[in-house]
């Protein structure tokens, strides 16, 4: 899978000291989102997991919006990873 290769690349690159970096957070949120999405395909009436999915989607959106406002250069570097993970572009004000 493509996403597992990204996890291994970023995990090796970042090690343990940079787990709070935006790239690592976006990647970990994306893996959680995909796992919950596949769970919800099997269990359509699991509303608590659906709520958790919406919360994680919001967290990922806020992290990306924060980065686009604070550091535009790093956000442009992250665009390649965002496009490869099939994340839709966030709407900024």
UniProtKB/Swiss-Prot annotation:
Protein's UniProt keywords contain Chloroplast: yes
Coiled-coil ranges per UniProt: none
SMART domains xref list: Ribosomal_S15
Main localization, broad class: plastid
GO biological process, one term: translation
Pfam families: Ribosomal_S15
Xref: InterPro entries: Ribosomal_uS15 (IPR000589), Ribosomal_uS15_bac-type (IPR005290), uS15_NS1_RNA-bd_sf (IPR009068)
Classification via CDD domains: S15_NS1_EPRS_RNA-bind
Subcellular location: Plastid, Chloroplast
Family stated for the protein in its record: Belongs to the universal ribosomal protein uS15 family.
Subunit structure: Part of the 30S ribosomal subunit.
PANTHER family assigned to the protein according to its UniProt record, in alphabetical order: RIBOSOMAL PROTEIN S15, BACTERIAL AND ORGANELLAR, SMALL RIBOSOMAL SUBUNIT PROTEIN US15M
NCBIfam families membership: S15_bact
The protein's name: Small ribosomal subunit protein uS15c
Gene name tied to this protein: rps15
């Amino acid at each position: 899978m493509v996403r597992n290769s990204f996890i291994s690349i970023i995990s090796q690159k970042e090690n343990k000291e940079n787990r709070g970096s935006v790239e690592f957070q976006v990647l970990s949120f994306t893996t959680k989102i995909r796992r919950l999405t596949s769970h919800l395909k099997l269990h359509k009436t699991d509303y608590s997991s659906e709520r958790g999915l919406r919360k994680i989607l919001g967290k990922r959106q806020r992290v990306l919006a924060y980065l686009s406002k604070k550091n535009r250069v790093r956000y442009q570097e992250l665009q390649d990873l965002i496009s490869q993970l099939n994340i839709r572009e966030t709407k900024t004000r």
